Amino acid sequence: MPKVRQSSRVSLRTLPSETSRSSRNGSRQPRHHDHIFGGYNKLGSYAKAFDEMFDNQGNVRGPYKGIFAELSPSDAEELEARAEALGRAFIDQGITFSLSGQERPFPLDLVPRVISAAEWSRLERGITQRVKALEMYLDDIYGDQEILRDGVIPRRLVTSCEHFHRQAAGINPPNGVRIHVAGIDLIRDAQGTFRVLEDNLRSPSGVSYVMENRRTMARVFPNLFATHRVRAVGDYSSHLLRALRNAAATNEADPTVVVLTPGPFNSAYFEHSLLARQMGVELVEGRDLFCRDNVVYMRTTEGERQVDVIYRRIDDDFLDPMQFRPDSVLGVAGLLNAARAGNVVISSAVGNGVGDDKLVYTYVPTIIEYYLGEKPLLANVDTMRCWLDDEREEVLDRIDELVIKPVEGSGGYGIVFGPDASEKELAAIRKKVIADPRGWIAQPVVQLSTVPTKVGDALAPRHVDLRPFAVNDGEDVWVLPGGLTRVALTEGSLVVNSSQGGGSKDTWVLASRTSGAARELGDAEVVRKLPKPAKAAPAEKGADSTSSQQQGQQQQQAVMR
């Protein structure tokens, strides 16, 4: 395996942030904002965060000047009309997520998040570097395990990870790619520095909202797209299809690709069906596939058809009842044996979870240096590992000022914010950390950056994160320009997950003046002359969560895992 040896041991601590300019430090100074930006007149705790539209003196930052000029003359009625137009468009298009068996619209805020061309170039390079290093790491872990033999990371880090699947040994992708799609979660700290919060290498969801957010915003704000060089996002599915077709065995000139879904009760089913439709491939459930002689076939109205690549949106544990959960009816019996025989490719690969485990995350800077011989271009959030004695003691001493996260948690569940926790909650999490040190990490409270967001009849700061999506086709790592910006709609909240009341924003990456990248075009205006509609609560479609064994086995993922 190609890698660069280091002359000295690399620190296992996460990297500190880059030194920031003094002009970016400190809380913002009060400045009166008129009209719809009145929500910025009482910042409260938001004054500690880096605001992406306004600098410390309240001046509008360069990438947002056009948006500010468009929105600032608006009154509350026009703001509400545009917001309702966005909401109606989502409901009309059936864009929902499932929460506790109920289909709910996914809130889209009307103020886009804007990233300059120069800033995006830095992020793109950092994401690409990270995906390449993690690809090499996974190939090594399920192969020669040189990184373990060299003592660069502890062997027990891998063997104790519940997503390290020995069943994946011997499954060698034809083009060497295990991470076909990655979602790298980023936050922007109080100094304005982007940091990696989490890696998602299994079935990262949310890209459908990126595309639908853009389509809807282009209808509601066509004039903004006409005056901004916003890079297009609609070609994601073509990049994904190319990656999946490239993943097939080299002797397959026209491989059959399918999208494997747990079914309509899964929280991300809308995304599964959208991607299948846009790629022009079949959307299948486990019952539509079967294995014979280590070959996977699809049942069709015209008979059996061999399947070459499966883009699965099912967790490993449900994928093959012969290898994992024997009670699963969501997967395909014999699928792993077929993959091991080289007759089908599973995308993303089985066992990728050993690369996005939250404890493994703390070693990714070391992994990058080991395999690539490069310094990480994107820093992690500073993280303490409770399984190391000295770091655990520090966590227990400072538990009331840290964020304590379960290593296996998702969707924002199980996180304890020390500063907001009661004595009873702190005592409970202390016991959990002591009982299972491997299961917990701790981080300082990071004031996520803020972007203006509609709150009532005004725009006010709300915290955001960002999930860019990277697609690896074996020749290149392509990063979708933008990604999913999630916003914590509840005042003061740092939790952006949709399952916890979060929403989303359209994410604009501006092209440079010399760029040849495709630009987004606005659709016909649908709002400016619209009368304000009467308010009515949209009916929600229920989902019977107990109708069958299969429903009971649906992985109840938050929309953005």
State where each predicted segment sits.
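Preference for protein termini
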Residues: 1-561
